[in-house]
From Swiss-Prot:
Protein purpose: Catalyzes the NADPH-dependent reduction of 7-cyano-7-deazaguanine (preQ0) to 7-aminomethyl-7-deazaguanine (preQ1).
Tagged with keyword Transcription: no
Top-level taxonomy: Bacteria, Pseudomonadati, Pseudomonadota, Gammaproteobacteria, Legionellales
InterPro entries: GTP-CH-I_C/QueF (IPR043133), NADPH_dep_7-cyano-7-deazaG_red (IPR050084), QueF (IPR029500), QueF_N (IPR029139), QueF_type2 (IPR016428)
Alphabetized UniProt keyword annotations: Cytoplasm, NADP, Oxidoreductase, Queuosine biosynthesis
Name the record gives this protein: NADPH-dependent 7-cyano-7-deazaguanine reductase
UniProt similarity note: Belongs to the GTP cyclohydrolase I family. QueF type 2 subfamily.
Short name of one Pfam family: QueF
């Protein structure tokens, strides 16, 4: 069954929404990662050829204490890339809203409930953190590397084309980034805007051609997580780096932003540095 068929049958995307009045964990819609990975010719009977996570920031998160007083927080959810499933975004939004009128002893009880529900849906332990005070908010940052967007290029390709990628014989270690990433929701067609950062060691990637490749996603319809895995696999196969990390930070929609990270490095650390567009 294709990802699109699963979504059309089960997702609330593109449908009139009735917001839940009470706690509703059944709203969470898990989608098998294998559905997309098969289209990338990834052997789904083996562990994926990368490590990483999907980091979600939730900006519209609230619940009641036992006296009925509302509390609010920013939520941080880290789903391992090795999990069998991802969570469809609108179902996640509705699930979070189902906490609005529920009473809990404290924030820890809320986060533990969410951790249990999410981990059950994706078949792996999900990390849940709450940011409760302004002093805990990470500052915006700019990647330490070369901005590709300043390059003067001509392009008329707006669907992913890995043949745009090219390398030289020189071996380098460098970080490249762009704020021109745009793809689209495969169900609603809504645009997904983001910034992408690529760090690698290997044959030097032609910067202009890489920018063209990034822009080629402009009319592509695929989820955030799937786009980043396509980026990773295309660069890995066509440019043959010894080390590769690809991460994207998407702007928020419906109170959520999604930030997938994929790497050849198994010892990565989770970083939640918000881009200036977030």
């Amino acid at each position: 069954m294709s990802t699109l068929r699963v979504l059309h049958e089960k997702s609330e995307l593109g449908k009139t929404t009735v917001y839940p009045k009470e706690y509703a964990p059944h709203l969470l819609l898990p989608i098998p990662r294998d559905l997309n990975r098969k289209t990338l010719n990834v052997n789904v009977s083996e562990p994926p050829p990368f490590y990483g996570y999907d980091l979600w920031n939730a900006y519209e998160l609230s619940w009641l204490n036992e006296k009925g007083k509302p509390f609010a927080a920013r939520g941080e959810f880290i789903i391992p890339a090795t999990s069998s499933h991802l969570i469809e975004s609108k179902s996640f939004k509705l699930y979070l809203n189902s906490f609005n009128n529920e009473r809990f002893a404290d924030a820890a009880a809320v986060s533990q409930t969410m951790k249990r529900d999410l981990s059950k849906r994706v078949n792996e332990s999900v990390t849940v953190n709450f940011i409760l005070h302004e002093t805990e908010i990470p500052v915006a940052y700019s990647p330490k590397g070369s901005l590709l967007d300043v390059l003067d290029i001509a392009i008329d390709t707006y669907s992913p084309d890995p043949n745009l990628l090219s390398t030289s014989q020189e071996t380098v270690t460098e970080t490249l980034y762009s704020h021109l990433l745009k793809s689209n929701c495969p169900v609603t067609g809504q645009p997904d805007w983001g910034s992408i950062e690529i760090h690698y060691t290997g044959p030097k990637i032609d910067h202009a051609q890489l920018l063209k490749y990034i822009i080629s996603y402009r009319n592509h319809e695929e989820f955030h997580e799937a786009c980043v895995e396509r980026f990773f696999m295309d660069i890995l196969r066509h440019c043959r780096p010894q080390e590769l990390t690809v991460q994207a930070r998407y702007t928020r929609r419906g109170g959520l932003d999604i930030n997938p990270y994929r790497s050849t490095n198994p010892t990565f650390s989770v970083q939640n540095h918000r881009s200036f567009r977030q």
